[in-house]
């Protein structure tokens, strides 16, 4: 069990940032995974009063505040229209509605959890993170970094024309995923993202041109096999490395078929 000595609702990002410079303090987000750990927090920093709990849609992008709940993301009409329903599909099996009403997008992204559906999904989009001190950084770059004392303010998803698909395999519906797989085709570039390896999600691009020159079943098989071959897998209680490699091929191919059927030829 985690113990908290002091609770502060930050009045500004500057106040939250300054408090967070002490290693004994912590930004709490939705407080769902943090409370399952052990240890002591001197000051728990809550960002709930800073107006970061919504999704703003502009002509160029979606601006998703760090305190936006997964449930709000799941139900957001604009985001789901843009991603052909992939946004909702990426989070709908995360525990339950009550959990998704509390869990935050920022907490999920900052945690860079190896089991994260959220990280897998957003890596398949043209996504950037806005950090209070670090500025705007591509999510793919941010996902590979270590943890520091900065504050994640929001996600920025550029509206790059494309088609999208998301699938995950779970041993039971509300369990943590055995493997996650997002796939996108934006302006001719295919991007497959594999997570729950078990490890942070990895982006795979069609660097060998396996999908160029027209989409066929043979090309889908070749690219799916390529993704399964290049992504490092591991074993845990939910599945073996060999099983995850098999799932990567199957889920990638099914996402490719979905993209083709939705007009991504």
Annotate the PLM regions.
Residues 1-265:
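C-terminal structural segment of proteins
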């Amino acid at each position: 069990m985690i113990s908290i000595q002091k609770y502060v609702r930050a009045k500004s990002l500057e106040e939250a940032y300054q408090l967070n410079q002490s290693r004994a303090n912590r930004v709490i987000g939705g407080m769902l995974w943090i409370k399952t750990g052990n240890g002591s927090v001197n000051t728990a920093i809550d960002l709930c009063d800073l107006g970061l709990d919504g999704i703003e849609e502009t002509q160029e992008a979606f601006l998703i505040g760090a305190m936006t709940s997964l449930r709000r993301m799941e139900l957001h009409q604009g985001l789901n229209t843009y991603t052909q329903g992939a946004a909702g599909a990426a989070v709908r099996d995360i525990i339950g509605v009550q959990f998704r009403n509390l869990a935050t997008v920022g907490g999920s992204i900052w945690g860079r959890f190896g089991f994260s559906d959220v990280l897998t999904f957003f890596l398949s989009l043209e996504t950037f993170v806005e950090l209070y001190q670090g500025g705007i950084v591509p999510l793919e770059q941010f996902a590979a970094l270590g943890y520091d004392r900065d504050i994640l303010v929001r996600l920025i998803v550029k509206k790059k024309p494309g088609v999208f698909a998301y699938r995950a395999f779970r041993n039971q519906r509300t369990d943590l995923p055995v493997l996650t797989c997002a796939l996108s085709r934006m302006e001719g570039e295919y991007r497959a993202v594999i997570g729950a390896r078990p490890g942070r999600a990895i982006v795979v691009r069609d660097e060998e041109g396996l999908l160029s020159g027209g989409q066929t079943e043979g090309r889908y098989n070749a690219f799916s096999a390529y993704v399964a071959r290049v992504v490092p897998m591991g074993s845990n209680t939910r599945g073996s490395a060999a099983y995850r490699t098999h799932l990567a091929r199957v889920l990638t191919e099914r996402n490719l078929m979905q993209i083709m059927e939705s007009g991504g030829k």
